Structures are given as C-alpha cells and as structure tokens.
Design a protein with these regions (language model features):
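Short, surface-exposed beta-strand/strand-loop-strand elements in extracellular ectodomains
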Residues: 54-64
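Conserved SGNH/GDSL esterase-like catalytic core that processes O-acyl groups on lipids
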Residues: 28-30, 151-251, 285-292, 322, ...
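Extracellular serine-dependent O-acyl
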Residues: 277-348
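Conserved small/polar residues in nucleotide/adenosyl-binding loops
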Residues: 352-356
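Serine-esterase "nucleophile elbow" of acetyl-processing enzymes
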Residues: 56, 90, 113-192
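Glycan-recognition and processing domains
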Residues: 1-27
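Short, well-structured beta-strand segments within conserved domains
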Residues: 42, 76-104
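Active-site segments of SGNH/GDSL-like serine hydrolases
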Residues: 232-239, 262-297
Length: 356
C-alpha cells in the first residue's frame, strides 16, 4: 500500500519545502514526518542529494531509535525500516539527523496490503525556533567517548539532531521545533566555515527554505507558515573564523560592526515575530568571552522585556569539540529551567497562528 506524502494523515514538523506536496524536501536538521499505522511492515522511498559527508536518516519506531545510510545516487531509493512487526498500532517518526550537508525528498511510504493509516495526535501548541550552528544541529553528538575532547575523525556518522540540546529542550517543554541551524555558520557572510571558501552567513540563509547552492536553487521561506513563541539565537562561535577580531580588540571597528549586525538581525526577527520571547546565547563550545559580552551589550541596548541573555554554567569553556549527548543533556536541563522561569505567559497560544 503506497502512502503519498500529501496524505493528510501524515504529520510534519520543521522548515520543510512543500512547493510540491507530493515530493516535500527536508532540508534542516530535526525536520520530521510522522505516520501512525497498523500493519507488520513499513518502507520509505526517498531521493537524496549530498554535498558532503555520508547521509543518514533517523527514525523512532514505537519508541526505539534507529538510522539508515542513504545512497549517494540522486535517484529514488526505497529503504526498508521494519518487517515482521506485530500486527498492531505503530508510530514511526522519520527525521533528518543532519543539516544541509544533504537534502532529502520524501516520495512516500509503503505498507503491507492489510495495513491501515491512523490519524496521529496533534502536534504541541507550543513552538520554538532556534537559529544556530552545528551545536544546535547535534553535530558529532554521538561521539560520547570524546566528551570534553576534540572531535574524532568522522564522515557525519556521529551527527544526530535528536540528541541536540535544541531538540532535547523542545521535548522537555512539549514544544514543536524549527531547528533553523547550520553547521559551521556565523552571522556575517565571509566568516565562519559554511560554504568555504566564500562562506555564507546567517544573514544570507535565515530567510531561506533552501540555502545550499550546491544542492538546489536558493528559495525563500514564508515566515507566515510558522510563528514561534520562543526564539533562540545560538550563534557567535564560528564568527571567530578566519579572524577572532572580538578577542583581539573588543572595541575594534570589526567588533562594533558585528554587534550592529547582530542587533539589526535581532530587531528584524522581533518585527517578524512581534509577540515572541527571544533568548540570546551561545553554547559551552570553547570561545572567547568577548562574544558573549557583545551579546550582553546588544541585549541591554535593545532593552526589551521580550529579550533575554542566557549563559550556561560552562558557557564558552565546556569543551574544545562538539557537544556530546551527556553535555547536550546538561545544556538542555539548564536552558529548559531558564525558559520555564520566564513564566507560562510566554506560551499564550491565543497570540499565535495555529499553523504547524
């Protein structure tokens, strides 16, 4: 039994390209599609386009997590997720483990002939959006033997958005998540690590559904499709490449320019999301504290009750490598507590659209 991607009984979450409803494209980490069904087997047909690293999709089937390797060929491929299941109700959440190192098109699910698709529970009414970098994507998170250490050599196999502090926090708070994050990215173009050697920054990518020019035509995002209650700005670490001007001179022209651009970006998002609460932060990945001091300065300058600066207990000094699962759990615990301390009123859903 073929289940088309535009079947109304499928449930989606994330910044996903639905221009072709029969072939939606998952771009961002933590984007997912969920299907509830009765039956004994399920497969999925996907078309993968890869820029770098090996591509892997993740899934949660009846509470148990798994993954599978995607082919590097651009054509459609059918992947068996499970066979010989008990003939009862099942829930599958198929999610994007990685950022735009690849994009994947969903072409449908295949169930047994005697299967039945069920209507899933509604998504949470609470909504979070994270604008961040590789840490927010869960990059190299599964390399748990390297907690507090530099990264091991890898080909993307340790990256898993499920274990990002961002998705952990959303689950803690029973909220939807748009993880609008990209590994290696900085705020400004020509800085950071994403799309070397020219380097694309958040300013060029934040308003796109497709922003990886090696994989597809660049395409704008319609912000009316998702209105978050809480917005987390979690960047300012890759910005020290190729030059850590903030560490060298806090008052330099480059440093002041960064603060001005950060403020303009924040104020633009505040206009797009006029009722949202904003949390400005970085992570425990090692970086010079002047980046966080700059963010604090912007927060004070904006001087809005909707804007908060948050520092983790190990902010900027926790690890020289990416954040592993135990470290992400601690970050999530601290961030969850901070968001909860802001009160229930930040989740007043009457102020927001109902679109997922």
């Amino acid at each position: 039994m073929h289940i088309s991607p535009d079947d109304k009984r499928l449930q989606y979450c994330g910044r996903i390209d639905f221009d072709d409803p029969k072939a939606p494209v998952l771009v961002y980490a933590a984007s997912f599609v969920q299907i509830c069904f009765t039956g004994t087997e399920i497969s999925v047909t996907l078309a993968n386009k890869r820029a770098y690293w090996s591509s892997r999709m993740g899934y949660i089937l009846d509470g148990k997590q798994g993954q599978f390797l995607l082919t590097s060929d651009p054509g459609a491929e059918t992947y068996v997720i499970a066979r010989d299941l008990e003939h009862t109700e099942h829930t599958l959440t198929l999610f994007k483990r990685m950022d735009s190192c690849h994009i994947v098109t969903l072409l449908g699910f295949e169930l047994g002939s005697d299967a039945k698709v069920l209507t899933p529970a509604p998504l949470p009414s609470r909504k979070i959006e994270v604008f961040g970098d590789s840490v927010s994507c869960g990059e190299v998170s599964e390399a748990v033997d390297y907690a507090g250490k530099p990264d091991p050599e890898h080909d993307g196999e340790y990256s898993n958005s499920w274990y990002s502090y961002a998705w952990m926090t959303a689950r803690n708070l029973h909220a939807q998540l748009h993880d609008t994050s990209q590994g290696g990215i900085a705020l400004l173009d020509k800085t950071g690590w994403f799309m070397a050697p020219d380097y694309l920054g958040i300013e060029s990518c934040y308003d796109k559904i497709k922003y990886q020019p090696e994989l597809s035509e660049v395409k704008p995002w319609d912000f009316s499709r998702y209105t978050p209650n809480v917005v987390i700005l979690a960047f300012g670490q890759n910005d020290n490449h190729p030059e850590d001007y903030m560490a060298e001179d806090y008052n330099s022209a480059c440093s002041e320019n960064w603060r001005q651009h950060y403020r303009r970006f924040l104020e633009h998002l505040m206009e797009l999301y006029p009722k949202a609460t904003f949390i400005l932060t970085t992570t425990i990945l090692e970086h010079n504290e002047n980046w966080d001091i700059s963010i604090e300065e912007v927060c004070k300058t904006v001087n809005s009750p909707r804007v908060h600066h948050f520092l983790y207990s190990q902010n900027g000094k926790g690890t020289p490598g990416h954040i592993r699962i135990p470290e992400a759990e601690q970050m999530s615990k601290e961030l969850t507590a901070f968001i909860e301390s802001l009160g229930e009123e930040i989740w007043d859903c009457l102020l927001y659209t109902s679109d997922a």
